[in-house]
């Protein structure tokens, strides 16, 4: 799997700012190509007796890896110490530890949509190419041809560096309560207009039922708005880095967000993140919930959910211009500061191997980045995920585009526009808020790109 550099034109870097980068994510990879390595001696026991520290995000995927750490230890003889915390705390701690120059971890899970550009600009992750090209370090089954191109797009930098291995894809979908829809004689909406109509008809405050729920909490709420932005045909920025977040499309997306959450959402939704939204939905108190694909497991768990067997999995309805599923992704990287790069690289190869990817799908814990996992999981007698969920996942992946701009200050982007969106829930004018947020964030983006 030798990886070679290519010259990257400046326009490719600029395209990373645009929502339209989704086409590239599913097509040719910028900056790298993958070929087969020469065969050689690879031994999982090469680093027997070593110990590594792993820093994971609390999620069904993090739980899955932790559950099978003993398998990795038995396979390699490498001991694993791990810490797993909620994503916001994980992101904050990662910055603090990397800036210290002596992070406590050797391996880190990263959310590409938030940390990819930040980590790359600061050179916080080891370039994996030397190890990928070392026949004694690269598992012959690493097999980049098995990885979805959307995942590889996120893992490879425009200059050709490979800073991580992709682990999970997260296209956004609409979960819906089939029982509530059937009671009103409604079909799953195919368009934004039908989505608004369904939310209005299913909203019943007298019974404590909301027509729609999604993230209202600032920062966390931006992917909800961007899901609508993409359907309206909008972009985050043009090819020169000028924000387009005050465009007519962006404002219409803001209006859609405001109507669904303020008019048909639950009381207090401005403070909802995904976990509060999930809780409401699995109690049968929301007709629709827009979020990432990886929540089927708790929704179908009778110890947690009151709507087992009643959950519908719907592809994001089409906007006026196009039908798009906002795409996010996660990966695993090796700290540039660690002295245990070899053992750490062994860990991330194991984490993204075909067995773990298949387990992820079997547990309905996420959308594997390996294409072989889909056939393997469905052929297994252990496969318990709803067929409709898998079909929704695959259909969503076909229309996916990145749900956030690939920029270093993406957290600041989410903070600034997240406040604007929360203000809209509380009655503020969408056009005014989008223009204000755009004016506030443009200098931040300009400074970041010049740096």
Locate the predicted segments by residue.
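Extracytoplasmic/periplasmic substrate-binding proteins
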Residues: 115-117, 223-227, 252-346
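Hinge/lid segment of periplasmic solute-binding proteins
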Residues: 39-46, 112-171, 308-312, 381-384, ...
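Long, aromatic- and glycine/proline-rich binding clefts that accommodate carbohydrate-like moieties
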Residues: 48, 311-314, 362-419
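N-terminal secretory signal peptides
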Residues: 1-12, 22-28
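Extracytoplasmic "Venus flytrap"/periplasmic binding protein-like
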Residues: 70-147, 179, 183-190, 287-288, ...
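Extracytoplasmic/periplasmic solute-binding protein
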Residues: 152-167, 172, 193-243, 286
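Glycine-centered hinge/linker elements that transmit conformational signals in sensory
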Residues: 198-205, 240-270
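Conserved C-terminal helix/tail region of periplasmic/extracytoplasmic solute-binding proteins
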Residues: 45-47, 51, 79, 182, ...
């Amino acid at each position: 799997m030798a990886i070679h550099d290519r010259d990257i034109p400046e326009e490719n870097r600029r395209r990373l700012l645009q929502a339209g980068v989704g086409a590239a994510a599913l097509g040719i990879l910028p900056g790298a190509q993958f070929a087969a390595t020469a065969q050689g001696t690879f031994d999982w026991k090469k680093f027997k007796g070593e110990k590594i520290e792993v820093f994971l995000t609390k999620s069904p995927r993090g739980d899955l890896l932790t559950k099978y750490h003993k398998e990795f230890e038995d396979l390699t003889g490498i001991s694993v110490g791990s810490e797993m915390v909620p994503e916001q705390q994980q992101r904050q701690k990662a910055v603090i530890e990397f800036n210290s120059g002596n992070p406590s971890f050797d391996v880190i899970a990263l959310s590409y949509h938030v940390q990819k550009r930040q980590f790359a600009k600061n050179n916080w992750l080891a370039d994996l190419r030397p190890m990928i090209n070392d026949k004694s370090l690269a598992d012959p089954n690493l097999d980049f041809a098995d990885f979805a191109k959307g995942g590889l797009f996120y893992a490879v930098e425009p200059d050709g560096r490979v800073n991580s291995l992709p682990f999970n894809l997260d296209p956004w979908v609409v979960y819906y309560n089939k029982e509530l829809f059937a009671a009103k004689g409604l079909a799953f909406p195919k368009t934004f207009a039908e989505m608004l109509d369904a939310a209005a008809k299913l909203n019943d405050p007298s019974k404590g039922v909301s027509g729609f729920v999604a993230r209202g909490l600032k920062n966390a709420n931006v992917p909800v708005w961007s899901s609508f932005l993409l359907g309206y045909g909008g972009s985050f920025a043009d090819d020169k880095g000028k924000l387009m977040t005050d465009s007519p499309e962006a404002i219409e997306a803001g209006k859609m967000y405001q109507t669904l959450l303020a008019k048909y959402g639950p009381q207090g939704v401005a403070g909802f993140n995904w976990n509060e939204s999930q809780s409401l939905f699995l109690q049968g108190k929301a007709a629709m919930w827009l979020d990432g694909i990886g929540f089927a497991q708790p929704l179908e768990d009778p110890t947690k959910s009151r709507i087992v067997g009643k959950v519908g999995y719907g592809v994001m309805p089409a906007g006026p211009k196009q039908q798009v599923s906002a795409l996010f992704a996660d990966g695993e990287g090796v700290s540039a500061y660690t002295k245990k790069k070899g053992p750490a690289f062994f860990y991330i190869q194991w984490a993204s191997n075909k067995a773990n990817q298949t387990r992820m799908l079997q547990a309905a814990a996420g959308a594997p980045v390996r294409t072989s996992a889909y056939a393997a999981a469905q052929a297994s007698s252990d496969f318990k995920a709803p067929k409709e969920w898998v079909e929704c996942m695959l259909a969503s992946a076909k229309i996916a585009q990145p749900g956030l701009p690939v920029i270093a200050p993406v957290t600041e982007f989410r903070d600034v526009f997240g406040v604007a969106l929360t203000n809209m829930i509380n009655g503020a004018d969408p056009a005014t808020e989008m223009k204000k947020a755009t004016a506030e964030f443009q200098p931040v983006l300009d400074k970041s790109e010049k740096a």
